[in-house]
Amino acid sequence: MALARCVLAVILGVLSEVARADPVLHSPLHRPHPSPPRSQHAHYLPSSRRPPRTPRFPLPPRAPAAQRPQLLSTRHTPPTISRRCGAGEPWGNATNLGVPCLHWDEVPPFLERSPPASWAELRGQPHNFCRSPGGAGRPWCFYRNAQGKVDWGYCDCGQGPALPVIRLVGGKSGHEGRVELYHAGQWGTICDDQWDDADAEVICRQLGLSGIAKAWHQAHFGEGSGPILLDEVRCTGNELSIEQCPKSSWGEHNCGHKEDAGVSCAPLTDGVIRLSGGKSVHEGRLEVYYRGQWGTVCDDGWTEMNTYVACRLLGFKYGKQSSVNHFEGSSRPIWLDDVSCSGKEASFIQCSRRQWGRHDCSHREDVGLTCYPDSDGHRLSPGFPIRLMDGENKREGRVEVFVSGQWGTICDDGWTDKHAAVICRQLGYKGPARARTMAYFGEGKGPIHMDNVKCTGNEKALADCVKQDIGRHNCRHSEDAGVICDYYEKKTSGHGNKETLSSGCGLRLLHRRQKRIIGGNNSLRGAWPWQASLRLKSTHGDGRLLCGATLLSSCWVLTAAHCFKRYGNNSRSYAVRVGDYHTLVPEEFEQEIGVQQIVIHRNYRPDSSDYDIALVRLQGSGEQCARLSTHVLPACLPLWRERPQKTASNCHITGWGDTGRAYSRTLQQAAVPLLPKRFCKERYKGLFTGRMLCAGNLQEDNRVDSCQGDSGGPLMCEKPDETWVVYGVTSWGYGCGIKDTPGVYTRVPAFVPWIKSVTSL
């Protein structure tokens, strides 16, 4: 009985719908929407009570069989006929309350769960026009209600579309193309006057396309053939439809089809970039998309090639790095650091970089860019992209040029401050520039692209200075050219507080990071301010470096006694250089001072390595010999009989000695562990005494040693108070970097009373 009642109720309901059907369209009579919530309909229940089921969609009414052929024969009708939306025409795309319809391809789950077979024609359709599936019933569409849920509603197509109908033409995909509007019965284009990304954002939103909206000009996707319908479109980017944007009247313009506007609505994927916070679309803070969130890029190691790649990926031809202070501040995450692009990347994340989110930066170091199209006349970096490599910061380094797909260097023949001025100008720096020669920032590894570059100092770019064929040279990488930009800023910060300089020892005022002699790497300028060198005067040769040394005060230097074995202890034969970094390039903090006195330990014998220690008094008046600065500071002495193996950590050796290939021109540094006394005794037997210590990394693949050119140089260790103490003087060893043969050093704590008695320190 219950089943019979249910069947009867269904039949009566169907008959009721047929009785209420419109005699012309055979569709349910019009009713306003959205209807007030009604508890009997699951679709309108509050979300907390709503069962997980498909909304009740408008099903086609069951018409008498005799009338069905008439329905099937209905053809597309013009928009002047009331309440008609042709099955293939772009008429209505909003509900009868003016709510925009969703695109049919945005709601496939609902279509898949809907029973009528005629609805299959709507699946995957990339438009939002109202439809009557199968030609039955009133046209309707999906929309999103006030609660953000997918709903459906009827359309009234009598006046054509409630929102302008838009399509993209000429692109490689449905996400890009020339913008065309349907108006007054025909398709037409938009003029690109004042067309920008804000306009593109509205177009993409109206088309239901998410992602990055970008405006394109000058008929980028080809010229249209219909009328030009709109001009001077000025959207803010927040509008739901282009109809809401300020614009010219329909059909009013002063353009040709060469100015047809286009857009691209690129899907958001990891690595997509944009410019944000600028006053126009071609400038701003560089931001990259990752895991659903935009973030910034740190400028550590940022080069002109990175700028070129970023601007090219954004659709521009050229660009320059800009101060991020010109753009709005950011509170977004810093996604990328140490980015390095080669110029061939098709995506920004193909550039070399740190892992996502790994950085040591603040937002003050965000990359800012200004990009320019080819037609703008703003080509600020013409010719060869350039970059600075292996400097202490982005304002200095070895000059490298990108030619024929490969980075290479410039030979320093004739290289002067005028050349440096041009390089720095091309990179966007305005301060004084200084040239550096003789591979001051290390030797490059690629080809040498240029030689005999001729600059007057007034050129805008390096390309204006090249007079010789690319690739033609007679140089080696030991002659690679470099520059320092904004030079005065570095110099004025270099003198420090006079009270601190005169009263302290063991202070490293300029070290910022540690790179790692054999197993070592270039140090930073001024990072080891007590490093000195003992040099022969020209009467005994070419003034070459003889030994390393350690500055103990303005007038006293510590070194090894064996340094005087060959040329004797005549003070007039030697000079001491402090504040040096590159042995062949004069620098502002460098001082070369004559020797007044040489004091060799009385127990030293030339045929032995014991007591291998000496003191050198510099020429000067009173206690003022070397001028102290951030690059010239004394080291601290240890306590008498102090055991560095127990009290010291973080030990380093420094010098200009053997690097494993040749003697270095730039100061080297290497971290070494202090080794147990018993190990050294077992290895060197009776040659190792209590006045010695040994240090070095003994692993086969990571051996670090101090070699011939570093004789007399310091072995420094850091104490808990962050001061540095000289615990050793480089003395002797078996070869350089040979397995199980650590370097041997004179143990300075054993000689503290002698040092103080000689120097009165």
Swiss-Prot record:
It is found in: Secreted. The active site is at 562 (charge relay system), 612 (charge relay system), 711 (charge relay system). Residues 166-267, 273-373, 386-487 form the SRCR domain. Disulfide bonds join 85-157, 101-141, 130-155, 191-255, 204-265, 235-245, 298-361, 311-371, 341-351, 411-475, 424-485, 455-465, 505-636, 547-563, 651-717, 680-694, 707-736. Residues 85-157 form the Kringle domain. One of its GO terms (biological process) is exocytosis. Pfam families: SRCR, Trypsin. Keywords: Disulfide bond, Glycoprotein, Hydrolase, Kringle, Protease, Repeat, Secreted, Serine protease, Signal. Transmembrane segments: none annotated. The keyword Membrane does not apply. It comes from the Eukaryota. Residues 1-21 form the signal peptide. Residues 26-88 are annotated as: Disordered. The keyword Secreted applies. Plays a role in neuronal plasticity and the proteolytic action may subserve structural reorganizations associated with learning and memory operations. Belongs to the peptidase S1 family. This is Neurotrypsin. It comes from Rattus norvegicus.
